[in-house]
Amino acid sequence: MTLASAEKEMAGVLTFFQKETRGFKTGKAHPALVETVTIEVYGTTMRLSDIASISVSDMRQLLISPYDAGTVSAISKGILAANLNLQPIVEGATVRINVPEPTEEYRREVIKQLKRKSEEAKVAIRNIRRTFNDRLKKDDSLTEDAVKSLEKKIQELTDKFCKQIEELAKQKEAELATV
């Protein structure tokens, strides 16, 4: 494992964390709320983002325009089945979703989840660091000074990515608190 590959793995953890937290409902309409919902169409299951365009029509409303108008009812059923606390409204060949304002209890629960997810991401970053350091110590071709230097660099990377995760979590928490 090289320093560059460790950094790439850490960046992957950060990207995964960003994708996970994008789906948290903040009370604002965002395509990420429903794009991964699975829909039963054409005899198979597909993601909503693969069979329709999802746009924000205003701050609290999503507009879903299926590529095939015949899938409107399946989209509506899929959204209801996903248990997202969202009520789809079928209007001809489109589906509208009004995003409800989150309750205080819901916000507290999402903030708990956010903190847990951010801690899991930081643990994953630290595990990458530990794996890298273990491999360094087993590498007989490196001098003690080289090992110390690389350990310092991997620690700097770990600190950088953990800080980015904390900042993202704080932004999301602030977003939840201001709605």
Curated annotation (Swiss-Prot):
Pfam families: RRF. Its main location: cytoplasm. InterPro entries: Ribosome_recyc_fac, Ribosome_recyc_fac_dom, RRF_sf. SUPFAM superfamilies: Ribosome recycling factor, RRF (SSF55194). GO terms for cellular component: cytoplasm. It is found in: Cytoplasm. CDD domains: RRF (cd00520). Keywords: Cytoplasm, Protein biosynthesis. GO terms for biological process: translational termination. One of its GO terms (molecular function) is ribosomal large subunit binding. Responsible for the release of ribosomes from messenger RNA at the termination of protein biosynthesis. May increase the efficiency of translation by recycling ribosomes from one round of translation to another. Belongs to the RRF family. This is Ribosome-recycling factor. It comes from Chlamydia trachomatis serovar A (strain ATCC VR-571B / DSM 19440 / HAR-13).
